[in-house]
């Protein structure tokens, strides 16, 4: 068997793994009612964007079987796409990323720290809690990414403290805002995730989680999110 055939088969296997993980993540979000489509008033993100949909990954911590499955898939993604040997410390972003970072660090047998949004304002004035050796290679873990803006502060804090970071793992990536990858890309950080809203809406439509009229609204938003406003 030639090297070319072998490399193609490995790539295909990885794509199958990604598709399985995306479908599992989408199904869990819908089954746990962590994926929302608005009824009366659209959702507003911290960036000021309006959206007919919202994902709440924080709810997943209350579902033991679901979170175990997702952590297994997250570790599979990390080891496949980043490499265990490329990570010295797992860092959770305050606050939603902390629990997921802890579970991932435990599964991978790695130290963990968490990064505050701002220095705590007293004592050591620390923004990073835990032990992070100078030059350590960190993986930032967060629950989700919309436009990537909130990750910038965490990345800067890690680097200012002497850490090295080139990857960020999220459970969910909206997948519709180019800035989410370009902003981090400009900082030399690659974004990894299990699923996007495209995966969720396909699963929702296939299994009847959302009625047809809501599916249409979501697809309109996903195709043109900038400046979206509700009709009527």
Per-segment meaning from a language model:
Residues 98:
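Portal/gating segments that form or line small-molecule/metal binding sites
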Residues 2-84:
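Active-site-facing substrate-recognition patch
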Residues 101-139, 147-153:
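Short, glycine/charge-rich flexible loops or terminal/linker lids adjacent to PRPP-binding catalytic cores
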Residues 84-94, 169-170:
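Short glycine-rich phosphate-binding loop at a beta-alpha junction
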